[in-house]
């Protein structure tokens, strides 16, 4: 069978469906999962990323989980390199890789074999200094002056991506988008299945998920990660849920501040889900399944049908 990728917005049930689909195969083929959720790369970031515990993985090998310390910076280029090596190794063992996750750039960099523009430390440092001196809003305005399309695609609060875009524009003399790949045949001839559901249903699922995260001990998890150096982590400290709890703890960590963190975490997940929907629905290669109108068994059947027919 061809490799499979399961994508879609956060909270839609990608991890569980992947396990159900693999179990339904009943051992006909050997299957291994490759994670494509950027924040699940981090050790200790379990509750807030809805990472499946080892006991819940049903004995199925998982890759790209718990491979970074929270002080390390996650990058698309590094993920692409190591995840691609995992997929090649899985295939070499005669097994089938299943990519599962919703981190948009991570998924596309892997399936479309992106090439990344070079970097110049001196240029990068200069733009980082500008960021520190003038702030992200003014630096984002400078990006808009140089490359309006790039500025429109990058949130005005995202200093790291703004710096990278300015670096690429300066080094290449071309718009940032010129270095992005065009969508073609997916790498390894991967079959891509997308999961989605009505927005109201997903919002309810997200509300339950956030309540569960806080109920299971997200705040204590953040306190533990602070001892591991979370504040020094460029990407880990900005993860949804973790950033909001950090803000609440900095403000004193009382019940009101933690309630605000919970609400902001929920709203952040809703915004992120909208962005994921928009991103993945632009990809004509995705076979979409509605998980809100079909029962779990039916969705598994549909996913298997798509996978087998494509193979």
From Swiss-Prot:
Organism of provenance: Mycobacterium leprae (strain TN)
Protein name, as recorded: tRNA dimethylallyltransferase
Family named by the database record: Belongs to the IPP transferase family.
Site description Interaction with substrate tRNA, residues in chain: 103, 124
PANTHER family membership: TRNA DIMETHYLALLYLTRANSFERASE
Complex formation: Monomer.
Binding sites annotated in the UniProt record for ATP: 8-15
Cofactor needs: Mg(2+)
E.C. number(s) listed in UniProt: 2.5.1.75
Gene responsible for this protein: miaA
């Amino acid at each position: 069978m061809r490799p499979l990728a399961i994508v879609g917005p956060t909270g839609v049930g990608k991890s569980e469906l992947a396990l159900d689909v693999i179990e339904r195969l009943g051992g006909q083929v050997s299957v291994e999962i490759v994670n494509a959720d950027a924040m699940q790369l981090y050790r200790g970031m379990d509750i807030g990323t809805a990472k499946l515990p080892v006991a819940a993985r049903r004995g199925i090998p998982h890759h790209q989980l718990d491979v970074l310390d929270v002080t390390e910076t996650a990058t698309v280029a590094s993920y692409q390199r190591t995840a691609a090596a995992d997929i090649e190794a899985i295939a070499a063992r005669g097994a089938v890789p299943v990519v599962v996750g919703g981190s948009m750039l991570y998924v596309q960099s892997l399936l479309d074999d992106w090439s990344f523009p070079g970097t110049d430390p001196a240029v990068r440092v200069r733009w980082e200094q500008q960021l520190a001196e003038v702030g992200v809003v003014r630096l984002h305005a400078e990006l808009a002056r140089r490359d309006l399309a790039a500025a429109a695609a990058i949130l005005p609060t995202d200093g790291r991506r703004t710096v990278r875009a300015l670096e690429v524009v300066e080094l290449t003399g071309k718009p940032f988008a010129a270095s992005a790949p065009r969508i073609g045949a997916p790498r390894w001839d991967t079959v891509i299945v997308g999961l989605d559901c009505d927005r109201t249903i997903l919002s309810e699922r997200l509300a339950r998920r956030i309540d569960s995260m806080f109920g299971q001990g997200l705040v204590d998890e953040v306190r533990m990660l602070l001892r591991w150096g979370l504040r020094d982590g460029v990407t880990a400290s900005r993860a949804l849920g973790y950033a909001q709890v950090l803000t609440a703890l900095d403000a004193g960590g009382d019940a009101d501040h933690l309630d605000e963190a919970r609400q902001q975490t929920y709203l952040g997940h809703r915004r992120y889900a909208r962005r994921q929907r928009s991103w993945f629905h632009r990809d004509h290669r995705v076979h979409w399944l509605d998980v809100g109108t079909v029962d779990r068994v039916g969705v598994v059947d549909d996913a298997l049908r798509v996978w087998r027919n494509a193979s």
